[in-house]
Curated annotation (Swiss-Prot):
Family to which the UniProt record says this protein belongs: Belongs to the protein kinase superfamily. CAMK Ser/Thr protein kinase family. SNF1 subfamily.
Organism of this sequence: Oryza sativa subsp. japonica (Rice)
SMART domains attached to this UniProt entry: S_TKc
UniProt region (PPI), positions on chain: 335-364
A single GO molecular function term of this UniProt record: protein serine/threonine kinase activity
Domain NAF intervals: 305-329
Cofactor requirements of the protein: Mn(2+)
Protein known as: CBL-interacting protein kinase 32
Amino-acid positions noted as binding ATP in the UniProt annotation, renumbered to this chain: 19-27, 42
Catalytic reactions on record: L-seryl-[protein] + ATP = O-phospho-L-seryl-[protein] + ADP + H(+); L-threonyl-[protein] + ATP = O-phospho-L-threonyl-[protein] + ADP + H(+)
Length: 438
């Protein structure tokens, strides 16, 4: 197994590992070679975007989002294009998903949940006021920065999964219905602002309760519960919080509470401070126009550099501060990705992962020392895909990265726990990693 890895550059950015995948895009960790700063780069396939007939809407929304500098919204720094790809350079957020906190510590205290909800409503309201709707608010789009502040990702990019029909309303097919408004599930066309608000209500419920308001193993029963807003508050929910949630989770979008009304709600207003930030637009949109006009003179340079040795310290650096800790440390915080080290030969690691995944209902696809685990039977929360990669960091030491490629965050955590029980004999305690290499 090689100890080298070919580096790929796009413009001034050096691309690293894949940190997220979707139907239309892949997200990679990258480094600005001029400043050394970490960024995330969302890579879109131009042909798919053109086929989807959403170019104008995506162009408009990306242009708007590039101008937005709200503290609770993930920034778009730059847009680049090549002959076949669109590269969107984004702020890199290091604190994991908001719902990791729920998985690790259970429901939040009311004042803590309120603070995150205030930040969420601020972000949503700001983007709505500029004509951009999210339409796909769910746990993996709610991130935390290193200071514990909420950052909403993928605003302005959700048009990739939408279709506008002759009635002028948005239509979508949803794979994860738990956070989705009744009018979206009915596919009769919907108002993006009111649909976003419903999702915010579901998110607030989870923060306060520690579980979803609408949950059922039968998909049709789940749809019925959502359509009728059939849910029960846990006994510890305060009356003011119940009152607000009941107004948000109103199945009729015409009578559902609006954001201006939420901003005046007594429960919401407690301890509320509107964020202060610089709204001056010193940003150019020339790069966006060049990409979507497909101007060849503005195509970014894509190139692969000579392979160089990859050691554990470079891997730690590439991970931008993410913990290299043992996968099975019971105190370790859950993330959408994790790593462990092993002294086993790579072929044995692959075999053990296969043996662990198949009884859990996963189909395993192998390519060299990369594995893709895909749930054979999609659950009510859609398909769960898990990507793993084995990297050699010393002659007898390997690092294994396990990450969620697609699917529900909470489902990934369940998979992770089951996998950990089977792979314990493969994992080597990483506390000695530095001694091994020194």
């Amino acid at each position: 197994m090689s100890t080298t890895k070919v580096k790929r550059r796009v413009g001034k950015y050096e691309l690293g590992r894949t940190i997220g995948e979707g139907t239309f895009a892949k997200v990679k960790f990258a480094r600005d070679t001029e400043t050394g700063d970490p960024v995330a780069i969302k890579i879109l396939d131009k042909e798919k975007v053109l086929k989807h007939k959403m170019v104008e809407q995506i162009k408009r929304e990306i242009s708007t989002m590039k101008l937005i500098k709200h503290p609770n919204v993930v920034r778009i720094y730059e847009v680049m294009g090549s002959k076949t790809k669109i590269y969107i350079v984004l702020e890199y957020v290091t604190g994991g998903e908001l719902f990791d906190t729920i998985v690790n510590h259970g429901r939040m205290r009311e004042d803590e949940a309120r603070r995150y909800f205030q930040q969420l409503i601020n972000a949503v309201d700001y983007c709505h006021s500029r004509g951009v709707y999210h339409r796909d608010l769910k746990p993996e789009n709610l991130l935390l920065d290193s200071y514990g502040n909420l950052k909403v990702s993928d605003f302005g990019l959700s048009a990739l999964s939408q279709q506008i029909k002759d009635d002028g309303l948005l239509h979508t097919t949803c794979g994860t219905p738990n956070y989705v408004a009744p009018e979206v599930l009915e596919d009769q066309g919907y108002d993006g602002a009111m649909a976003d608000l419903w999702s915010c209500g579901v998110i607030l419920f989870v923060l306060l309760a520690g579980y979803l308001p609408f949950e059922d193993s039968n998909l049709m029963t789940l749809y019925k519960k959502i359509s009728n807003a059939e849910f029960t508050f846990p006994p510890w929910t305060s009356f003011p919080a119940k009152r607000l949630l009941t107004r948000i989770l109103d199945p009729n979008p015409m009578t559902r509470v609006t954001i201006p009304e939420i901003l005046e709600d007594e429960w919401f207003k407690k301890g509320y401070k509107r964020p202060e930030f610089d709204e001056k637009y010193d940003t150019t949109l020339d790069d966006v126009y060049a990409v979507f006009n497909d101007s060849e003179e503005h195509h970014v340079t894509e190139k692969k550099e000579e392979p160089e040795a990859l050691n554990a310290f470079e891997l730690i650096s590439m991970s931008a501060g993410l913990n290299l800790g043992n996968l099975f440390d019971s105190e370790q915080e859950f993330k959408r990705e994790t790593r462990f080290t092993s002294k086993c030969p790579p072929k044995e690691i692959v075999r053990k992962i296969e043996e662990a995944a198949k009884p859990l209902g996963f189909d395993v696809q192998k390519k060299n020392y990369k594995l893709r685990l895909e749930k054979v039977k999609a659950g009510r929360k859609g398909n769960l895909n898990v990507a793993t990669e084995i990297l050699q960091v010393a002659p007898s030491l390997h690092m294994v990265e396990v990450r969620k490629a697609k699917g529900d965050t909470l489902e990934f955590h369940k998979f992770y726990k089951n996998l950990s029980r089977t792979l314990k004999d493969v994992v080597w305690k990483s506390d000695d990693l530095q001694n091994q290499l020194s």
